[in-house]
Every structure is written in C-alpha cells, then in structure tokens.
Amino acid sequence: WSEVICKFYALPDGEVIGRAYIRKSGKFSALPVFWEAAATGCEISVDEETGKISMEKLATVGDVGLAINPALAEGQDIGAATMGMGIGLFEELIYEGSQLVNGSILDYRLPRFSDLPRHVELHLVQNQDGVGPYGAKGGGEASLNAMAANIANAVDQAVGVRIRKAP
C-alpha cells in the first residue's frame, strides 16, 4: 500500500495541491512559488551569572498571499516560531551510553508559556500573488526555519559568544 499511497499523493512538477496542476504554458510557464516565505527576529537577555537566555521580543513576517483564515495563519506562524525557540534554546536528546535518558514528555525540555516573550509582533503580507484560491499561498510554519539562527546571533550580539550548534 505504501507505493500506492506515495504515488497518489506525490506532487510531480507543476502540481500545486491535491490532483490539480498548473500547465506549463502561457503566463504559467514557470512554476510559481506556492509556499509561504517568512522572516523572523528576536531580542534576548542573558543572565551573566547563570547564563540563562530569555527571549524578550519576537517579530515574524509571513508572506501568505492571502490569509483566508487570518487567525489560523497567525497561529501557525507564532506556533512555528515557538518550536524554533525550543530548538534554539532547550531541545536536546541526552544519552548515557546508548540509552536515551530524556525520552518522555516529562524529561524532554520544550518551551513553556513562561518562556515566551512578553512582546510579540506578527505580520502577514497579503498581496494576493499566490496560485491558490483568491491569491493564497500554502502558509504555515515558515517562521520556524530561522529561529535557532536568530537566537544564536542575538547571543553573539549580547555577550560576544558565537553559538554554532543547537542544543
């Protein structure tokens, strides 16, 4: 069954979503961008005695073409930024020999509500240039991608220490 499912749901060149596709002729001769592009930034503070990093401000901008459901699109972006914050600050698989010691939700460190910044700015760019309905693009979770690098750069700017690896 796996081959049948993969073949049915695969996205060959020109296919946008589901079973529809864009013909490569006329104004659609080049496959258009269908996914969300995003930019993120953050400000952090570092406790010089403990080394604890706290995120003070977070900003995200996502180009979604058109947010058919703006609350959902905003939730996707802020949730993705929070996941990226976890990657940049907390998440780490810890082993003793070959045994994973933090393999449960009780032991694996994820962001808590208390870790979230007090100031969040979220913007959706909606210029209706997507190939989806009414100019929508495939929005969701693009703000995840750069968060760990944002945190590393903010730490370098704050205390002059370059982080080159996520926890």
PLM ranges: what are they?
Residues 1-167:
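Cofactor-binding beta-sheet edge motifs in enzyme active sites
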